[in-house]
Amino acid sequence: MTARGAHAAAAAAAAAAATLATSAANAHAPQAIDAAAAIDWWPVEPWVLALLALTGALHALGVVRVWRHTATGRAVHARRALAFAGGWLVTAAALVGPLDALSARLFSAHMVQHEALMVVAAPLFVLARPLGAWAWALPQRWSRALGRFFHRPGWRTPWLVVTGPLAAWLVHALALWLWHIPSWFEAALASDGIHALQHASFFVGALLYWWSVLGARRNAGAAMASLFTTMIHTAALGALLALSPVAWYPTYADRTIAFGLDALEDQQLGGLVMWVPAGFGYVACGLAIALRWLRRDDRLGHAA
C-alpha cells in the first residue's frame, strides 16, 4: 500500500470511529433527555403541604395578635418572625418542588435536601421560638390547656433530659450515621413511609440538637464543644462518602445516567456537600457563639 493509500485508510478509519461515537452519543442522548423530561418536578405530598400551610398560617396569625396586644418587644418578635419565615421557606423548598424531585434520582440532591433541613431550617426554627406565636393563634382556652400540659413535671423532665447537650448530640449523631448505613438508606428509597420516618428523625434530631446549642439554657462552652465535635463527625461521614472507591447505594446506579453522572460520582458530590458546606455551618455558628461570649466577658470586665 502506498503512503497516500495508508493516509487515506487512516482518515477513513478515524471518520468511521467518530461517526460511531457520535451515533452512540446520539443514541443515549434521547434516553437521557426523556428520563429528565419524565420527572415530575413539582411532586405534591398532601400531608407535607397541610403541615406547611397550618404551621405558617398559625404563626402569622399569632404574630399579628402579639403585635396588637403588646406595645413592647416588637423588634424581638420581628426578628423571631423573620427567623421562622426563613426556616419555613427553606423547609418548603426542600420538601416541595424540584429539589425533592431530584433527591429521588441524585444522591447529591438528597444530601442538599437533608443538610437544608438539618443545618439551615432547624436552627432558624429554634431561633424563632414559634410555640409562643402558635399559642397566641389558638383560642385562649386551648392555649391555657397546652400551657398547663407542657409545664407538668411528667413532660418537663423528659424534655430537659433530651435537650441536654450530651443527649441531644447523641440523638442527632445517631440519626445521621444510622440512616446512612446502606441497607437503611436503601430501605428509605424503596418505601415512602420509611423515607418519611428518615426525614422526621433527621429533622426532630436536628431541632433537639440546635435547641441544646441555641436554646435559653445553653452553656456557651458546651455549645462550642458540641458544634466542634459535630463538625468533626459529620465531616468524617462526608469524607467516607466522597473518598469511597465504591458506590454505597445501588438504587441510584440507573437513576444518575440521565444527569451525566455515574453513581460513584454522584455519591462523591453528596459527600462533599456534607463535608464542606454543612461543616461550614457548624463552624460559623460556633464562631458566632464564641464572639458573643467574648463580648459579654468584656462588658463584665469593664463593669467590674
Range-by-range predicted roles:
Residues 2-5, 23-304:
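Alpha-helical membrane segments of multi-pass proteins
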Residues 9-12:
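Transit-peptide-like, low-complexity N-terminal presequences
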Residues 14-15, 25:
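Cleavable N-terminal signal peptides
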